[in-house]
């Protein structure tokens, strides 16, 4: 499923935070998620991407799938 949004839905639903989507990185790879001043808040994308560039393209083009639950 293609998804295009600007705010993290899981961050809003589960944490009550309006946070912009951005590319983040974990040991598993790059993903689309949110963070605040304390660090990562939510992983929003179902997918992990092999590179920052691939994740950024997916974010810009809406080529990623929203996780339903954290």
Locate the predicted segments by residue.
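Short N-terminal "domain-start" leader segments
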Residues: 1-33, 61, 65-70
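Secondary-structure transition/turn motif
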Residues: 34-38
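A short, exposed loop/beta-hairpin motif centered on an aromatic-Gly-Thr core
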Residues: 39-52
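An amphipathic, aromatic/His-enriched active-site/gating alpha helix that lines ligand/cofactor pockets
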Residues: 58
């Amino acid at each position: 499923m293609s998804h295009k949004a600007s705010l993290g839905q899981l961050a809003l639903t589960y944490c009550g935070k309006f946070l912009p989507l951005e590319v983040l990185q974990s040991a598993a790879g790059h993903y689309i998620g949110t963070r605040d001043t304390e660090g990562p808040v939510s992983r929003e994308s179902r997918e992990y991407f092999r590179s920052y560039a691939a994740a950024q393209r997916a974010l810009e083009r809406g080529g990623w799938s929203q996780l339903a639950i954290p």
